[in-house]
Each structure stands twice: as C-alpha cells, then as structure tokens.
C-alpha cells in the first residue's frame, strides 16, 4: 500500500472519529485525531492480523494504553473490517458494544481491555514475555499518550521490558504535547522522553507521527532491532486536520456541537479533495 492510499484511509479514520464523538456528544477527539496515522499504518501495513479471524493465535497484538482515545481505535478497526463502519454512530450509546473504553469481551479485534492510564503497557509487556516463553513469533504493539507517561507504572513496565530484552515489543508514544490540563511540559514534564526510554535499555526512534515514510521506516527498524524493545516517539498534532481542534488542549475530551461537526467534516472533505488531486 503506497503513501497516498494510507493518507486516504487515515482521512476516513478521522471522519469516523469526528462522527462517533459527535453522535455520542462525548469522547476524546484530540488524541484520537493525533494518532490516526499511526493507527492506519499499524492496521493496514504493519501488523499480522485477520479481521475474519480476530483471535488467531499467531496474530500480532495491540494494546491501547491510552484507552480513552477509542474513537480513533474503533474507527480504524471498522475501516479494517472488524465490524461495520456504520456502527460508529452508536459510540457510547446505551446498549452499544462500542463504549468509552475498549472491551476485549465484546469488540472484535480488541486484544486487551484498557482505560486506567499506565496499565496498558504492563499488559503489553506481559504478552511479549508470554510470546518469548512459548517461542511464538507474534509481535506486541502498545500506544501510549505523552501525558500518560507521567504514570509511574509506565516506567516499572519499561524497566522490566528492557531487562527482559523484549525485542518483540514496540511502544509508541503519541507526543502531541497536550493533556487535559494543558501543555504537558507545564503540568509535569516527561521530557526528554527518548532519554528516559534509553535508560531502560530501549532502542529509541524519533519520528514525525504524520509522515508515513518516517512511520514505515521506524517500524522496519524496530523489526530489525534485536535484544532490545523499541520505543517510537511520534511527534504529532493534537486534533490533526480539524482546523479549530488543532493544538488545543480544550479538545482533549470535548464533543463538537452540530455547527462544529459540520465545520470539521468540511475540513476533512478538503483534505480528501487535496489527496484526490495527487
């Protein structure tokens, strides 16, 4: 799949994010939009998965550690064929299987229930250790928020991953620079993120999280890295491609009203039109 095809899918993922949060009148659009390109590459290029057989023993595993950003997660799962795209409008509705945090018992393609920040990476480390103990070839991927890494449990898990030399584990940090309280550097700065992971024996790669060429190169490098887990620090834009949401902490956990929804969808339509002209 080429760069343009991936960009078009990522734009569809972003449409699903905006649509689901608007329908629910609740949710977390900012950090979902910032991670849409990472989600797209993982599910359409990187991971060994089969939507027709989501529990295949040899599948790669993904853990959404920043579990509140389900609008992006559900949107890419729907685009990949795990369930109908039309179901996204039931997000957070009473009786829907698509609730605010992912549930592995109810949603096809979800490998781990998550939500409490800091816990997802621990589950991912456990999965990676399990694969090593059973000599299985599957790889484990986990997506963290940059605000999330203020949680101490993240670093306990990172310490163990580095100690166990889990080269089948890839940690991705969505570094959009903002959390619900504002700029992460002002709230409780985790910088330098790369040096912290290096201190725990991680191979670290810094990338532009919206550049598919850099994303592809990073995951290729991670596959070639032996004897160390990999941390990909992806610099991203919170609210990416929605004009009034970009780089605004206020859109961490706010749903657009009808007027804002129309503007957001028009923004994404313009992105689509620009991509179609390439």
Question: Which stretches of residues belong to each language-model region?
Answer:
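N-terminal hydrophobic or amphipathic helices/low-complexity stretches enriched
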Residues: 1-13
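N-terminal capping segment at the start of a domain
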Residues: 10-26, 174-176
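Glycine-rich beta-alpha junction loops
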Residues: 68-69, 73, 176-177, 211, ...
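Short secondary-structure boundary/capping segments
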Residues: 80, 187, 246-250
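Thiamine diphosphate
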Residues: 109, 113-116, 121-225
